[in-house]
Amino acid sequence: MRLYIKQKIFSLGERFSVKDEFGNDRYFVEGEWLSIPKAFRIYNAQNQEVLSLESKFFSFLPMYQIIRNGEVAAEIVKEFSFFRPKYRIDGSPFSVEGDVFSHDYTILRDGAPVASISKEWFTWGDSYMINNYNGEDEEMLLAILIVIDFVLSRD
């Protein structure tokens, strides 16, 4: 299953849709415009919140908590690195490998590739594709993409 994310370049409220390979809306992502620290909400096609992404305000490096059903499901932490951005996902079997800076990387589950994320260049606004090989937790894959993209855009 493939998911396509198209962020609108002039979207003040940072709301964008996530479509499946057939063009159907699967999710909507909404960034809280004036919140400090920055937060995102992911809604399914029935407009029910499935995940929230909340930044830890007092941390040395960027850290986001992924919250599902009121519980912290995972934390994504940008690790200190001199050359290329590196991310650690705590509390989850997922890890990130590849060229995150170029928005071309692989998501691994317990060391085995389960999805790839790539950015389409030269498009109006940011466009991404998540290629989910085995039907993994697509909400978590989407959350990983959103956090990494947001942190990279702030560096």
Place the predicted regions along the sequence by residue.
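Intrinsically disordered, low-complexity proline/glycine-rich segments
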Residues: M1-D155
